[in-house]
Structures are given as structure tokens and as C-alpha cells.
């Protein structure tokens, strides 16, 4: 197969590093924080994860696009990643579920992307210097000077509240479960078969989190990020779920206030990723920006109570500071990569959080039993 003519593209980092390659997405420009993800598969799930808003994602696996794309693998209604960086795009996408090639998918979603660069060199820079502000410039008139100027214009994620930007604007009900191989679909479960009612705060929720809850018997009501606690509690939930999301948790004062009000009740609370960080802030801890963050599907995490080590999917650039935990908040999990805090639990309430992604998508589901723990916490209320 003859390789088609390509459009030039440039990736510039704020430190002055320049990478020339070819465009595989939309023409134009994009700026954001450049991070690297070590997952070998799941590029469509990564692109559509709202937690990647304002981030340009570098995939360290060299061949990306082999299996094309399918609507069934999307984790939200659009691509949220600010841009994509890869080493090599295969000429053919081959998979029985493939509906659209990766380049066509990127163009349809107006996503700027670059291929043909040395991603190993780029990853070393990001690993040694930390996440960098950057720019991808795609088009025949792209220049290094312009790309560098744009890269340095990005203010960074510190202090940036993105949860309210990616959140839904109106509440909705979710009853779709995990993918069924026989029907090749995500089946919709009748409300009569879902005994638990969970209210989920959407700070950038992934579809597979909602599916995991439904698969365990939950009818889920998804609320906008800025919904007051009074409105959430008026729905008479059996449990409150705090979703994942992008950006810095500290500016999300509306969410912190709402969680504090929820914690005044006896309703079980479970937080993932940004939701975990917001639970920590609402309980009196502080959060910090990490040098490189955790982005991948192979991160070992240890359960501090049992000693069990689990391989987890991770995607975060901020974390709760363990040294700041108040007396009523204890550490439950730690990263074996860098020792950062991965799990917390209130000692005075039925409330806990996990920094990684138990729902995976992509990645392993070693930590999925945390969903079962949430169900068990709600069971006494439902059984009464």
C-alpha cells in the first residue's frame, strides 16, 4: 500500500525542545500539558477520558492505530485530550470491531495529532524534567518559532478548575451495563432490576465507571459538578459517588462544600481519581501537583492493610498529601512506583477514595472489588 501524502506538524515544549513529524489529525494548533501514557492498548479510551482535558497525550507504545476505532470503546461523548503524540501510525487498521481509522476519528473530533517523532526521547524529557507545557502545530505553514511561542503561552494546570467545564449541564439517568459479547452491546437494565440508587457527581465521569455500578445493581443518577448537596440529597440516594475528572482539585470549592455537606449524613461515599482528591480536601487534607503524574495501565499499588499488590490503571497529575491527613482520615493504599498516596478512608464515616481507576478501560481490573465494597456499604440501608 502506498503511503499517502502527509501534512507537516511540529511539537514544541516550553523548555525549547522541538520535534518535527507529520499530522495525523486535524490541521491547526493545540496547547496543553504534555504527559506520557505507558498503556500498550486502549488509545480510544484514553483520548475520550475527560480527565485528559487540556493535556497532550504521548503514547509510549510505538504502534498506535492498529485496531481503528469503534463507538463502543468511547469513554465519553467526545475526544477530551488536547492532542495526541505517537511514534508510528500503521497503514492499515484491522479489527472486526473497527468502524473508523484513527486519523479519520481524530479529524472528525477536531483533534490535532502528530506522528513520526522520537517518543522515547520525548518521554525521557518528561520523565526527567516533569510534565511540560507544549504545543502541536499542524499545517503547511507551521513554524518552530510559532509552536514554541504557543507552548509557552499555556498557563499550566495548577489552579485550573476543569471539572465544571467537562461536566454535564443537566442531570440524567444511566442504566447501561458492561459490554455483552453475545449481543455485541452494552445492555440497558430495567430499573426494576436495580435495587440501589447511586447519585454520581460528574467531574468528568467515564462511561465504564457507570457501567460498573449498573453491573452491580445500581440505578445511577448523574449530576452536574456544581449541583448543591441539598439537590443531591433530595433524590434520596443510597450512596454518593464522586467521579474522576481533570485539572486541579483545589479550586473546585463548590464540590468541596457539597461533599462536606454530604459527609454530615450517614450516606456511603466513594470517590475515584479527582473525586478521591476532593474527598481528601473536604476532610481537611491538602493536594499537591506531581512532577510527572501517573498515566498508564501497569502501576503497582499496595493495600496497606492486607499487603496485597494490585496492578492498576492510573491517570492523574495531582495527589493528596499523606503528611496532611487529619486524624479522621487514614491511608489505605500506596503506589509502589513512588510511594504516593493511592487510597484513603474516613474513620468516622462510611467514605473512602481511590486515586487510580478501578474501572480500568483501559487496563487491569485488580481494584474493581472497591465497587463491591461500595455496594456492601449501601446494602444495610437498602435492606431495611
Swiss-Prot record:
Reaction(s) this enzyme catalyzes, per UniProt: hydrogencarbonate + L-glutamine + 2 ATP + H2O = carbamoyl phosphate + L-glutamate + 2 ADP + phosphate + 2 H(+)
Q: How does it assemble?
A: Composed of two chains; the small (or glutamine) chain promotes the hydrolysis of glutamine to ammonia, which is used by the large (or ammonia) chain to synthesize carbamoyl phosphate. Tetramer of heterodimers (alpha,beta)4.
Aminoacyl-tRNA synthetase is among the record's keywords: no
User: PROSITE patterns given for it?
Assistant: GATASE_TYPE_1
Task: Spell out the Pfam families in the cross-references.
Answer: CPSase_sm_chain, GATase
What's any GO biological process attached to this entry? Answer: L-arginine biosynthetic process
Q: EC number(s) in its UniProt entry?
A: 6.3.5.5
Gene3D superfamilies in the cross-refs: 3.40.50.880, Carbamoyl-phosphate synthase small subunit, N-terminal domain (3.50.30.20)
Pathway the protein contributes to: Amino-acid biosynthesis; L-arginine biosynthesis; carbamoyl phosphate from bicarbonate: step 1/1; Pyrimidine metabolism; UMP biosynthesis via de novo pathway; (S)-dihydroorotate from bicarbonate: step 1/3
- Its top-level enzyme class, in one word, is ligase
Q: Which residues form the active site?
A: 273 (nucleophile), 357, 359
Q: Which residues bind L-glutamine?
A: 51, 245, 247, 274, 277, 315, 317-318
What this chain does, per the entry, is described as: Small subunit of the glutamine-dependent carbamoyl phosphate synthetase (CPSase). CPSase catalyzes the formation of carbamoyl phosphate from the ammonia moiety of glutamine, carbonate, and phosphate donated by ATP, constituting the first step of 2 biosynthetic pathways, one leading to arginine and/or urea and the other to pyrimidine nucleotides. The small subunit (glutamine amidotransferase) binds and cleaves glutamine to supply the large subunit with the substrate ammonia.
Q: Name one GO molecular function term.
A: ATP binding
* Ranges for region CPSase: 1-193
What is the protein name for this chain?
Carbamoyl phosphate synthase small chain
Would you identify the family this protein belongs to, as annotated? Belongs to the CarA family.
The chain positions of domain Glutamine amidotransferase type-1 read: 197-384
Keyword set, alphabetical order: Amino-acid biosynthesis, Arginine biosynthesis, ATP-binding, Glutamine amidotransferase, Ligase, Nucleotide-binding, Pyrimidine biosynthesis
Q: Which InterPro entries match?
A: Anth_synth/Amidotransfase (IPR050472), CarbamoylP_synth_ssu (IPR006274), CarbamoylP_synth_ssu_N (IPR002474), CarbP_synth_ssu_N_sf (IPR036480), Class_I_gatase-like (IPR029062), CPSase_GATase1 (IPR035686), GATASE (IPR017926)
Amino acid at each position: 500500500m502506498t503511503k499517502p501524502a502527509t501534512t507537516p506538524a511540529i511539537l514544541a515544549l516550553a523548555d525549547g525542545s522541538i520535534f518535527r513529524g507529520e499530522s495525523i489529525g486535524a490541521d491547526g494548533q493545540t496547547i496543553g500539558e504534555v504527559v506520557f501514557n505507558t498503556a500498550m492498548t486502549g488509545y480510544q479510551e484514553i483520548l475520550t477520558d475527560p480527565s485528559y482535558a487540556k493535556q497532550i497525550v504521548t503514547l509510549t507504545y510505538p504502534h498506535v492505530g492498529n485496531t481503528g476505532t469503534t463507538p463502543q470503546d468511547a469513554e465519553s461523548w467526545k475526544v477530551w485530550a488536547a492532542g495526541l503524540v505517537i511514534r508510528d501510525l500503521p497503514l492499515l487498521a484491522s479489527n472486526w470491531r473497527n468502524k473508523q481509522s484513527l486519523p479519520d476519528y481524530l479529524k472528525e473530533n477536531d483533534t490535532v495529532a502528530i506522528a513520526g517523532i522520537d517518543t522515547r526521547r520525548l518521554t525521557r524529557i518528561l520523565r526527567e524534567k516533569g510534565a511540560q507545557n507544549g504545543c502541536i502545530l499542524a499545517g503547511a505553514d507551521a513554524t518552530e518559532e510559532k509552536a514554541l511561542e504557543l507552548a509557552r503561552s499555556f498557563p499550566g494546570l495548577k489552579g485550573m478548575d476543569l471539572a465544571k467545564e467537562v461536566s454535564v449541564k443537566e442531570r440524567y439517568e444511566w442504566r447501561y451495563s458492561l459490554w455483552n459479547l453475545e449481543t455485541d452491546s452494552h445492555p440497558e437494565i430495567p430499573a426494576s432490576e436495580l435495587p440501589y440508587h447511586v447519585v454520581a457527581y460528574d467531574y468528568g465521569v467515564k462511561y465504564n465507571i457507570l457501567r460498573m455500578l449498573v453491573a452491580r445493581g445500581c440505578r445511577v443518577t448523574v449530576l452536574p459538578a456544581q449541583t448543591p448537596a441539598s439537590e443531591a440529597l433530595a433524590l434520596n440516594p443510597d450512596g454518593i459517588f464522586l467521579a474522576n475528572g481533570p485539572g486541579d482539585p483545589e479550586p473546585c470549592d463548590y464540590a468541596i462544600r457539597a461533599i462536606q455537606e454530604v459527609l454530615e449524613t450517614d450516606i456511603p461515599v466513594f470517590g475515584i481519581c479527582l473525586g478521591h482528591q476532593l474527598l481528601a480536601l473536604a476532610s481537611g487534607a491538602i493536594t499537591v501537583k506531581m512532577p510527572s503524574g501517573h498515566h498508564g495501565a501497569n502501576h503497582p499499588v499496595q493495600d496497606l492493610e492486607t499487603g496485597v499488590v494490585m496492578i492498576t490503571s492510573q491517570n492523574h497529575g495531582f495527589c493528596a498529601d499523606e503528611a496532611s491527613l487529619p486524624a479522621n482520615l487514614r491511608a489505605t493504599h500506596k503506589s509502589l512506583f513512588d510511594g504516593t498516596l493511592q487510597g484513603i478512608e474516613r474513620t468516622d464515616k462510611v467514605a473512602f477514595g481511590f486515586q487510580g481507576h478501578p474501572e480500568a478501560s483501559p487496563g487491569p481490573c485488580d481494584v474493581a472489588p472497591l465497587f463491591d465494597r461500595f455496594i456492601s456499604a449501601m446494602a444495610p440501608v437498602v435492606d431495611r
